Design a protein with these regions (language model features):
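N-proximal low-complexity "stem/linker" segments adjacent to membrane-targeting elements
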Residues: 1-62
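A recurrent flexible, glycine/aromatic-enriched loop bordering the glycosyltransferase active site
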Residues: 182-193, 204-226
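Active-site-proximal specificity loops/subdomain of glycosyltransferases
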Residues: 78-139
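Conserved donor-nucleotide/metal-binding helix-loop-beta segment in metal-dependent transferases, i.e.
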Residues: 151-181
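A short, conserved alpha-helix in the catalytic core of glycosyltransferases
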Residues: 233, 242-259
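Short beta-strand-to-loop acidic/aromatic patch adjacent to the donor-nucleotide binding site
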Residues: 138-152
Length: 276
């Protein structure tokens, strides 16, 4: 469900027509010869036991422009880790797994705690922060995309559309945020509809003009778990383990990137994920 509305300070890239995914991927494949692109997948092992993760892996088999896929795996014992590794081995591109419940990662967390660096908040924020560090250790990675692993109707076009604005040299964006329609016969997107948007707009009415609140209000789906950014931006951001990753990341991007280098991208006409 697309439109032509450019409604504020954030550039909105709508899905105005069905461009074949093969065309997008061909351009990304050419770009990837000069700019290495990495996909970060934060996942719980339980998501491998749902229809969503096998579908995501099946779709990613057709992606040829990624330098690497990095799985950030949480809540997995040894047997679960081996099963997840078996699933991921089906991909054609190199795969790295950061196993947060594994002995080496646990040893690292204990070492950090001993040195007064609190790691007491396991969750998506901590998982992404640690995994980003391992990706950024490769100094020649140009851009990183991240999306959730509970997308039931995942298509590889979503990844291509998410990465394209930050990867393409003619567009010059540093950060892209995914959005999508949540129009069904049920009230999905409740946290955004009933909490996030009313809260932000109430604060704007109470406080008057505030550029940061205007920035947050300009995203069509601020709580979406899909974004891509260039590695130079990723190196400077702080990721909070205690607050929502999605909103805290927008706060960091607001402070560190020029507004005209931030965009939001229409990823899909419909979007369905695992509901809580």
């Amino acid at each position: 469900m697309t439109d032509f509305w450019q409604h504020g300070m954030i550039t909105t890239l709508q899905k105005l027509r069905e461009r074949p995914v093969g065309e997008l991927e061909a351009e990304l494949k050419a770009i990837a010869r000069r700019r290495k692109l990495v996909l970060l997948l934060p996942a719980l092992y339980s998501e491998f036991e749902t229809p969503s993760m096998p579908r995501i892996i099946e779709e990613l088999k057709g992606v040829e422009y990624l330098h690497r896929v990095v799985l950030s795996l949480d809540r997995a014992g040894r047997n679960e880790f081996e099963k997840a590794r078996g699933f991921m081995s089906a991909l054609k591109c190199p795969v790295r797994i950061v196993w947060h419940d594994g002995p080496r990662m646990k040893k690292l967390y204990r070492e950090l705690v001993r040195n007064d660096f609190s790691m007491d908040h396991p969750g998506k924020g901590r998982s992404v922060w640690m995994t980003l560090g391992s990706i950024l250790a490769e100094r020649d990675v140009y851009a990183i995309a991240l999306h959730d692993c509970d997308i039931v109707n995942y298509r590889r076009e979503m990844l291509a559309r998410l990465l394209f604005p930050v990867a393409h040299p003619a567009l010059d964006f540093e950060f892209s945020k995914g959005y999508y329609a949540r129009v069904t016969d049920q009230l999905y997107g409740r946290v955004t509809r009933l909490f996030y948007t009313p809260l932000i707009r109430t604060l704007r009415r109470i406080l008057g003009f505030n550029p940061f609140l205007s920035f947050l209000d300009n995203f069509r789906y601020a709580l979406s778990g899909e974004f891509a950014l260039i590695s130079s931006l990723a190196r400077g951001i702080r990721i909070s383990p205690t607050w929502g990753l999605e909103v805290s990341l927008l706060s960091e991007v607001y402070q560190r990137a020029s507004i005209n280098r931030i965009c939001q991208v229409d990823l899909a006409e419909t979007y369905e994920h695992k509901h809580q």
